[in-house]
């Protein structure tokens, strides 16, 4: 309907083009996910099926949007980092965030049975999303460090909380009151002395979250026998707060 008398309504649209030459982070979060996990009988404090499904949905997002150089996930959230030179949807914030969150949600629903089997999906989940800009490499590393530190803090608290509720028979309010004002050392001591749980021995995924990135792997051609290095998307549960990770995989932030 080009050049029609109604075309003026386009002038009401607000421009939302993101700044050039900065890292774009699209962070998605589950909306009312506590209710969703309760309705679908998620194990507490961590449900391996749910975490694996989140990782799978995020992996498919990374395949669909190759401008994503690294992604980090914990619980019901995922952060996708798009390279500085990304020109996806001409860097329109609303288009980028809505496309990524809708694709993530569709993959979550589509692949539900792969991870939950005959456990029925009673209603689809909802995720919100936003774009945040980070100008420097140090900023983006600090952002990812913040999310991984948050993973540890939340998981330590939840591990203690559910141990008190499920193993010690505390009510939710009693468990909250007992944990109020405690620090990491106290929580670790509680887990070990009262529940024989060594927090450091829990799966790394629970404590460190999930990192998706392109990792160099050696592949051998079956016909020629020649081996060459290729980059493949992998999901790992590693420390990204220390510089060791970034020194081992410098190409991640070199993808500008």
Swiss-Prot record:
InterPro entries: Thg1_C_dom (IPR025845), tRNAHis_GuaTrfase_cat (IPR024956), tRNAHis_GuaTrfase_Thg1 (IPR007537), tRNAHis_GuaTrfase_Thg1_sf (IPR038469). GO terms for biological process: tRNA 5'-end processing; tRNA modification; tRNA processing. Its cofactor is Mg(2+). It catalyses: a 5'-end ribonucleotide-tRNA(His) + GTP + ATP + H2O = a 5'-end phospho-guanosine-ribonucleotide-tRNA(His) + AMP + 2 diphosphate + H(+). GTP binds at residues 29-34, 75-76. Binds 2 magnesium ions per subunit. One of its GO terms (molecular function) is GTP binding. It is found in: Cytoplasm. It comes from the Eukaryota. Pfam families: Thg1, Thg1C. Mg(2+) 1 binds at residues 29-30, 76. The keyword Transmembrane helix does not apply. Keywords: Cytoplasm, GTP-binding, Magnesium, Metal-binding, Nucleotide-binding, Nucleotidyltransferase, Transferase, tRNA processing. The keyword Metal-binding applies. Belongs to the tRNA(His) guanylyltransferase family. Adds a GMP to the 5'-end of tRNA(His) after transcription and RNase P cleavage. This is Probable tRNA(His) guanylyltransferase. The gene is thg1.
């Amino acid at each position: 309907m080009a050049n029609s008398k109604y075309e003026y309504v386009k002038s009401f649209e607000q421009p939302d083009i993101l700044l050039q030459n900065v890292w774009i982070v699209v962070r998605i979060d589950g909306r009312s996910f506590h209710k969703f996990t309760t309705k679908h009988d998620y194990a507490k404090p961590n449900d391996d099926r749910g975490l694996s499904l989140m990782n799978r949905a995020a992996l498919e997002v990374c395949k669909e949007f190759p401008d994503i150089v690294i992604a980090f996930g914990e619980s019901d959230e995922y952060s996708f980092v798009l390279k500085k030179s990304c020109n996806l949807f001409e860097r329109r914030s609303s288009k980028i965030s809505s496309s990524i969150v809708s694709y993530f949600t569709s993959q979550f629903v589509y692949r539900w049975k792969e991870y939950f089997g005959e456990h029925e999906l009673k209603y689809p989940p909802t995720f919100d999303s936003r774009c945040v800009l980070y100008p420097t490499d140090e900023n983006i590393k600090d952002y990812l460090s913040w999310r991984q530190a948050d993973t540890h803090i939340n998981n330590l608290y939840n591990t203690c909380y559910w141990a008190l509720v499920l193993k010690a028979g505390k009510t939710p309010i009693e468990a909250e009151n007992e944990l109020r004002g405690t620090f990491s050392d106290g929580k670790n001591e509680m887990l070990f002395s009262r529940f024989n749980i060594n927090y450091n021995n829990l799966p790394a995924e629970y404590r460190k979250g999930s990192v998706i990135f392109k990792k160099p792997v050696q592949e051998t051609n079956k016909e020629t026998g020649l081996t060459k290095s290729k980059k493949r998307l992998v999901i790992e549960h590693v420390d990204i707060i220390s510089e060791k990770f970034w020194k081992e995989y410098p190409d991640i932030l070199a993808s500008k």
